[in-house]
Structures are given as structure tokens and as C-alpha cells.
Amino acid sequence: MQDPIQGRADGSSPVSVHFVNNVLAAAASYIEEEPDTARDVLAELGAFLSHRLRGPRVVSAAEELEHVGVYLRLEQARFPGRLEVELPASRDLPQARIHPGDVQAPLSQAIERWLRQQPGRVRVALRAREDGLDLQLDRPDEPGEAGERLRIPLALEAAGSTT
């Protein structure tokens, strides 16, 4: 069995150490002025790590979207006031089973790219489609700027399959 902290056989890691360090730093920054926020951030980080470090398996698209919501709340704690988030209701998701991280990984890459490009807010909207999700990123403060669209397919296994 692989060690989830050390990573996978292909050299990838289920969790970015850089991300975890940044979330812990964000939580530390809230301790004195906003202790409830600090506790919430640490609880969300615990949920995030629990989901990502459980090992190889598949989950429902709804469970993965719930995990994506946790991830996005952690990013909002790291970048206060910079991320607006819109997620579809779980009932609108396709009935698919996917690997944990199949949605969060491309989403985190896109968010990181957009946050580093320039200061300002970034709106992140995921919309359910029959066979996946559409990710839309844009800057609400700059309506004329072209946004970015990314298609995230969700079709690993039929909903009735178990692994």
C-alpha cells in the first residue's frame, strides 16, 4: 500500500505541501483577531486532508463537489475577499463516480493561475452538465475582460459501480 503523504507511484502527491502550509499560515493569521475563523479553517483543513488521504477509491460526483466546496472555503481563507464562489446543487450533478481530486486538481491550478496574474477578485463558477462540469473563471471588477472556461468531464464509472 502506498503512503498517501509520500505520494503515488507516478510521483504525484494527493495533497500539495505548499497548499497545506499556506492554509496553516492563514489559520495562524486569524488566531488573535478572529479565533472562530481560525478554528473553522483548521476544521475545514482536517476534512480536506481526510478526504484526500484516504487512499485509492472512487466517490460520487456529489461527494467530490462537497470536497471542492471545502477546498474553496480554504482558498477563501487564504485569500480573503478575493474569491467569489458559485457551486451547483448536488441534485443537479450527473450520476457518476470519479476519483477524489478529479475536479479539485484542475480547479486549483486554474485558481492559482488567476490569483497570481493580477490583484483583484476572481469569480469561480461551476455549472453542472449532463456529462460533467463547466468551470468559468472571470474578474467581476473587470466586466470587459475575457474569462476562462474549462470543461471537467465526470464519467469514470456508472453510478451503480463499486470500487
Feature names for model-found ranges:
Residues 1-15, 19-153:
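Two-component histidine phosphotransfer core
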Residues 160-163:
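C-terminal end segment of the histidine kinase catalytic
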